């Protein structure tokens, strides 16, 4: 099948930018070849309205270098909404107002997640790979050691096997005080994309809010939230895209409800509004060997409005690290092929971004946001761009 060049739909190449304080500048991003920016107003506290004035100020800054604010990632969902406590109805109304304002300002894709307390979780933010570059890693024994011996979460010991607890004890005894404190910081101290950071005591208090909230109840709260806001999103021309759980399993006793194809299907069935869409993150979902990423791309293609391309290398013990974008356990060729075919079928260029990247080359000497250094993502974007173009040239 041959498509005329002007009829070929390739992805919109985007880049996550953390605003004026990001060490990676808009000019850096432009030189990387991205055309769209993925951004959020991190200076606005969770739950408050994003005003037209604040949105336009940021949009004009992005456009001043010839880039486009393509995707919001994220408008955070307040914890009161997730637990349906306190001022949750007020925060839902504020969320609606933010969606109206974003639509009015011409920004039409809004990412969010419904993960309790934590955004994404890693135990090591500077795992050294054989080539000397650094990646993000999740080590299960260290994670359990944090839960049992540092956080000392009530009832945690019942959630792990005897073998896991023994490995965690050995791992904990190997740590010196500096390593223990680093693990605590890595686990709970506001990673990029997380809007809150906590002391251990505050963190446990936040976990306690979810006592009595299992996966079924949290899903009910998510569906309630979406039924409240999707009509507003429809009217504003905004597509909501939910990010999957990272990692896609229960952690610290917290429920997870966006971890697999069945979770996606349940959400679409419950809230069929056109604005109820998905962010397919191959890195988050790829941690579970049960997730067929190519199949999910094809099955949910009409709902996928944003894609994160990332690969992970996992092992049998539940550990994983973030691999190079074209390596690891994700079959990026077939996922990209399905993505490319989806865009031709829908006749649309869908935003994608290289999700995370290794800290490498010059960035090893710099202070960077974990996972969001420049050169590793530049490499990832170049590889993904080449893969997409190569597939397109070979089949269209």
Curated annotation (Swiss-Prot):
A GO MF label: ferrous iron binding
Pfam families assigned to the protein according to its UniProt record, in alphabetical order: UxuA
Species in which this protein is naturally found: Bacteroides fragilis (strain ATCC 25285 / DSM 2151 / CCUG 4856 / JCM 11019 / LMG 10263 / NCTC 9343 / Onslow / VPI 2553 / EN-2)
Cofactor or coenzyme needed: Fe(2+); Mn(2+)
Keyword list, A-Z: Iron, Lyase, Manganese
InterPro entries: Man_deHydtase, Xyl_isomerase-like_sf
NCBIfam families in the record: PRK03906.1, uxuA
Pathway(s) served: Carbohydrate metabolism; pentose and glucuronate interconversion
Keyword Translocase belongs to the record: no
Family to which this protein belongs: Belongs to the mannonate dehydratase family.
EC number assigned by the record: 4.2.1.8
Biological processes per GO annotation: D-glucuronate catabolic process
Protein name stated in the entry: Mannonate dehydratase
Reactions catalysed according to its record: D-mannonate = 2-dehydro-3-deoxy-D-gluconate + H2O
Record function comment: Catalyzes the dehydration of D-mannonate.
């Amino acid at each position: 099948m041959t498509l005329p060049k002007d009829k070929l739909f390739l992805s919109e190449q985007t880049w996550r930018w953390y605003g004026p304080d990001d060490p990676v500048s808009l000019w850096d991003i432009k030189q990387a070849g991205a055309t769209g920016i993925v951004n959020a107003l991190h200076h606005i506290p969770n739950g408050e309205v994003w005003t037209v004035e604040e949105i336009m100020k940021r949009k004009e800054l992005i456009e001043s270098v010839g880039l486009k604010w393509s995707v919001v990632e994220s408008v955070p969902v307040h914890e009161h909404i997730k637990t349906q406590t306190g001022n949750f109805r007020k925060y839902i109304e504020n969320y609606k107002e933010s969606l109206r304002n974003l639509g009015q300002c011409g920004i039409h894709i809004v990412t969010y997640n419904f993960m309790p307390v934590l955004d994404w979780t890693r135990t090591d933010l500077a795992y050294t790979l054989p080539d000397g570059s650094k990646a993000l890693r999740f080590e299960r024994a260290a994670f359990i050691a944090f839960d049992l011996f540092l956080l000392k979460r009530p009832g945690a010991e019942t959630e792990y096997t005897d073998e896991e607890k023994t490995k965690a004890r050995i791992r904990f005894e190997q740590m010196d005080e500096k390593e223990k404190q680093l693990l605590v910081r890595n686990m709970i101290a506001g990673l990029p994309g997380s809007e809150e950071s906590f002391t251990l005591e505050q963190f446990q208090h936040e976990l306690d809010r979810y006592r009595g909230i299992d996966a079924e109840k949290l899903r009910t709260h998510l569906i309630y939230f979406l039924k409240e806001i999707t009509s507003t999103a429809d009217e504003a021309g905004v597509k909501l895209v939910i990010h999957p759980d990272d990692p896609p399993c229960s952690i610290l006793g917290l429920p997870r409800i966006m971890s697999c194809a069945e979770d996606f299907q349940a959400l679409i069935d419950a809230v069929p509004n056109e604005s109820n869409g998905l962010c397919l993150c191959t890195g988050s979902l790829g941690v579970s060997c049960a997730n067929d990423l190519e199949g999910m791309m094809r099955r949910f293609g009409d709902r996928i409005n944003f894609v994160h391309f990332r690969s992970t290398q996992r092992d049998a013990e539940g550990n994983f690290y973030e691999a190079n974008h074209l390596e690891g356990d994700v079959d990026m060729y077939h996922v990209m092929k399905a993505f490319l075919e989806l865009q031709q079928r829908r006749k649309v260029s869908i935003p994608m971004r290289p999700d995370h990247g290794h800290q490498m080359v010059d960035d090893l000497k710099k202070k960077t946001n974990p996972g969001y250094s420049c050169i590793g993502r530049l490499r990832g974007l170049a590889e993904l761009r080449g893969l997409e173009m190569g597939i397109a040239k070979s089949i269209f």
